[in-house]
Amino acid sequence: MSRQLISSGSPFEPQIGFSRAVRTGSRIEVSGTAPIRDGKTAAPIGLYEQTKLCLEIVAAAVIEAGGRVEDIVRTRVFLTDISRWEEAARAHGEVFRDIRPACTFVEVKRFINPQWLVEIEASAEVA
């Protein structure tokens, strides 16, 4: 089975040794995606804005791997403050209101960069 690696240009990809997304067959897995724009943390911006940026990066990776946003079947939203889940949910709902993938919101202690408030993982199945 062929394996396609997708990079978003994050400086952490070569440092840690991971891909933004990996496609094997019809499956696309998107790594935990932080609010990084042009190789730098997009901060200080709020949780809603960070979530929107993460979702844009996730969508771009899925599209680059030959999928569509509509092919996303699962998302995992990691937050440093679960009491603010509605801010992230608003951004998530704007993208996925009609697609409605399986979704989990989880609180974590912190991320690599303390300015990050959210990271998002996704799985897609290309029809």
Predicted regions and their residues:
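Short, polar/acidic, helix-capping and beta-turn segments at strand->helix junctions
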Residues: M1-A127
